[in-house]
């Protein structure tokens, strides 16, 4: 009996991320818009989204309550699960040989998505990967090939298979509880306790990089069994260092039937340096991007400036130029790639920006949404607010959430009386029992600011889906927004802070945002400079620090004290607050003008032409090109 369904033929696109069953960030948004495009569905009748069932978390352990397998069971259709006892024989023949070879479990099925169903493949490898310790017999040879061919040298502790007793108990555990033993809550609690008491070693690791390498072989072997049998090809779309090792495996062993595209959504090594600096310097976009600018001018590469050559993510990312096609989500990401490794400058890096979803908003709809949102705000925070600021972002250092408080410190004194009381809603997500250091520091500052009762209140909302369950929608929140804040230190593109643009909001964007150059180009086509656009304010500590003459060489930028950079950052916050107040509409007429100018800019950023004219050409391979099998594997294998 065939292992194929009628819908399972034709060209297939494979995407490995953490978002096979749920949209978490910009990458998931891109996928949703791509999947909804008829031109994409015509080019790729099959889409396979791949994820690990659970993601490694602190101390090299797992959080099984986050299992994506439950998502697929609840919101999709499961054809096969190596985590349960009984499966159709035809699917067992496909997956069990790979599971037994690598000691992993697969969950395979499909779910609804924009434009039609997609296939989903989840991989549970919690029995074979724990921190940097790996119990996968095939991995040493794969690591040796990566080292020989790509210079990738990762600090894995490769051990033999799990003892028979563990494997037997894991079998029983997954048949009863639907997870492998390595994902069992009690196992992970014991592991964390052992680490805290010094009984086990769990050094700080780039868990994503470790996971990426271990995923590559079992996922590739499963793809070989799921790939089209009608002569159609397969394209692996890699967007960051989690998915690049799978592309490398395909370059080594899948050239007959597979092509690879590296469409960089972010570059992790620069991001880490922006967020944490070198040797505890602390977060600074001004330091890193001014060093990068000088490095590119002088022909330097990242590992010549920073000690990153042993970082796993750096070793993985620097070889992405080997893929058949290379693209980037923004010109700033393309610059980061060229700084990462000089070989990215030897071939075209196609910039395909993200699109934007304009929210249909007339003046009456805006006023109605505003009434709903402000009524809720009055009930929740006890005041009749006259100005609404919003920021929706994940709890990550790179989002620069403290900069919102910096701006509010100045707005509190600059806002005219008729604009008070004002409210900033910061919508994010955190674990109440164990908030991150970043979130804990933010809450401390917010509490101190609110205690001063300046007429501007900051509300932290711990619910990423907010306002679900209330009498208004997320689109209503954007319609009601007067000022949308987004002052990230690292932002490969930056969609969130632009969502309210078409609703007439003043959008504060980061100078480091990948979207900035795209917006600047659109403004120029409209006959406006970026600085003159009434709906845009650019928060640019990078340029401000350079203009202030804080440093003039890579060495002096690296040595600059954090306190000096912080003082410059605060001056930027003051300038941003002044620009926001200057742009606030004084009456309904000016409000309508802001709505018109915001919509005019927003509608020129649609997804559809970007997908049709730029992204699909990056992903599609003409038949003659697809059949031109490179000798890469023969030359390097």
Predicted regions and their residues:
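Catalytic cores of nucleotide-sugar-dependent glycosyltransferases that transfer UDP/GDP/TDP-activated
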Residues: 1-637
């Amino acid at each position: 009996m065939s292992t194929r369904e009628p819908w399972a033929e034709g060209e297939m696109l494979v995407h490995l991320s953490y978002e096979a069953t749920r949209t978490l960030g910009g990458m998931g948004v891109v996928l949703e818009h791509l999947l909804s495009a008829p031109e994409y569905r015509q080019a790729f009748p099959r889409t396979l989204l791949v994820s690990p069932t659970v993601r490694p978390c602190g101390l090299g352990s797992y959080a099984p309550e986050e299992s994506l397998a439950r998502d697929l069971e609840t919101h999709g259709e499961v054809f096969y699960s190596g985590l349960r006892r009984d499966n159709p024989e035809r699917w067992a023949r496909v997956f069990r040989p790979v599971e037994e070879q690598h000691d992993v479990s697969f969950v395979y099925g499909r779910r609804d998505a924009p434009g039609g169903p997609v296939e989903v493949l989840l991989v549970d490898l919690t029995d074979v990967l724990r921190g940097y310790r790996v119990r996968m017999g095939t991995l040493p040879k794969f690591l040796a090939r990566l080292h020989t061919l790509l210079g990738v040298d990762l600090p894995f502790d490769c051990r033999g298979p799990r003892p028979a007793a563990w494997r037997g108990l894991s079998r029983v555990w997954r048949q009863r509880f639907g997870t492998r033993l390595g994902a069992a809550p009690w196992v992970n609690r014991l592991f964390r306790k052992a680490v805290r008491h010094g009984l086990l070693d769990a050094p700080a690791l780039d868990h994503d990089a470790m996971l990426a390498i271990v995923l590559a072989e079992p996922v590739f072997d499963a793809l070989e069994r799921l790939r089209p049998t009608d002569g159609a090809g397969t394209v692996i779309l890699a967007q960051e260092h989690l998915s690049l090792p799978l592309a490398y495996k395909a370059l080594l062993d899948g050239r007959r039937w597979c092509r690879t595209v590296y469409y960089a959504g972010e570059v992790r090594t620069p991001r880490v340096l922006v967020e944490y600096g070198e040797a505890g310097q602390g977060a600074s976009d001004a330091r890193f991007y001014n060093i990068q600018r000088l490095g590119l001018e002088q022909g330097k590469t990242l590992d010549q400036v920073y000690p990153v050559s042993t970082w796993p993510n750096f070793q993985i990312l620097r070889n992405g130029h080997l893929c058949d096609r290379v693209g980037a989500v923004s010109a700033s990401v393309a610059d980061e790639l060229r700084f990462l490794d000089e070989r990215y400058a030897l071939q075209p890096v196609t910039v395909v920006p993200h699109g934007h979803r304009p929210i249909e908003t007339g003046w009456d709809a805006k006023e109605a949404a505003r009434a709903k949102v402000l009524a809720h705000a009055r009930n929740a925070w006890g005041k009749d607010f006259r100005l609404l600021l919003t920021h929706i972002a994940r709890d990550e250092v790179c989002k620069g959430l403290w900069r919102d408080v910096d701006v509010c410190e100045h707005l509190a004194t600059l806002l005219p009386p008729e604009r008070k009381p004002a409210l900033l809603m910061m919508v994010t997500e955190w674990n109440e029992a164990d908030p991150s250091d970043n979130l804990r520091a933010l809450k401390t500052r917010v509490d101190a600011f609110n205690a001063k009762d300046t007429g501007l209140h900051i509300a932290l909302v711990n619910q990423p889906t907010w306002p679900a369950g209330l009498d208004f929608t997320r689109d209503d929140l954007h319609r009601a927004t007067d000022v949308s804040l987004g002052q990230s230190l690292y932002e490969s593109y930056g969609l969130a802070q632009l969502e309210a643009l078409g609703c007439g909001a003043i959008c504060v964007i980061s100078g480091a945002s990948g979207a900035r150059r795209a917006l600047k180009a659109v403004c120029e086509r409209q006959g406006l400079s970026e600085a003159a656009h009434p709906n845009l304010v650019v928060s640019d500590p990078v340029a401000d620090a350079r203009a202030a003459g804080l440093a003039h060489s890579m060495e002096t930028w690296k040595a600059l004290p954090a306190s000096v950079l912080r003082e410059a950052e605060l001056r930027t916050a003051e300038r941003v607050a002044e620009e926001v107040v200057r742009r606030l509409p004084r009456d309904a007429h000016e409000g309508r003008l802001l709505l018109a100018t915001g919509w005019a800019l927003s509608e020129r950023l649609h997804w559809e032409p970007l997908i049709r004219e730029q992204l699909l050409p990056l992903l599609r391979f003409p038949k003659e090109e697809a059949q031109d099998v490179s000798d890469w594997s023969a030359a390097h294998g």
